[in-house]
Amino acid sequence: MLLPTVRSRIAALSSRVASRAAYSTTVPRFTENAMQPNDPTPRPAKPNVSETDATPVDSMGAWDAALQESTDAAERVRTMQAPNRKGTWASNQKPRAEAMSGPRFEQTIMHLQPTPMAAIELIHKQPVRWVKDKIVSCDGGGGPLGHPRIFINTDKPEIVPCGYCGLPFAHEHHREYLKSLPTSSYPLEPTGAAEEVNENQRVTEGATGYEQR
């Protein structure tokens, strides 16, 4: 009498185990495809700015003047990644035109929105830091505006920028070779530009080496 009952319980238990084993949390998931397929007939980009922005609107005391913006100026600000750069400059960035789209931004005054300047052009105005060691360190000056300290190899005849802040480094032994090249991505000597950071500047207290030049 007990044999059929035991068999039924074993069968029910085995089915539960099999169903549980079919699901696993370690199965790799499909990640987002970063490379988009080629579209032979791409759709033209449509403006996302409403023509009503050209109509003056009372700012209700927030500004001295009325809120007003032409559609051409608003569309130009909306599609620019930064005031001094049109496109993206990093692989993990998304175009600003894709982010600021939809009904939410149709009646938004674009020139009043935060638009920070891109520092990628400013960092290329920093002169090369000539060093005598094959391995130097950089922490961006330390403090709240710095970055984790990393080590940079300067043994090759090339300008090596810091992976965090972009400050350029090169070995003193390769100075003549780098100066003989027709072009350079960084100034080889100080040019006196206002954007240059003083090489004697030290943010990290008691820092040694080349944390912030």
Curated annotation (Swiss-Prot):
Pfam families: zf-CHCC. It comes from the Eukaryota. Residues 28-56, 182-213 are annotated as: Disordered. Residues 28-38 have a biased composition (Polar residues). InterPro entries: Znf_CHCC. GO terms for cellular component: mitochondrion; respiratory chain complex I. GO terms for biological process: mitochondrial electron transport, NADH to ubiquinone. Migration on a 2D-gel is shifted by co-cultivation with L.plantarum. This is Lactobacillus shifted protein. It comes from Emericella nidulans (strain FGSC A4 / ATCC 38163 / CBS 112.46 / NRRL 194 / M139) (Aspergillus nidulans). The gene is lbsA.
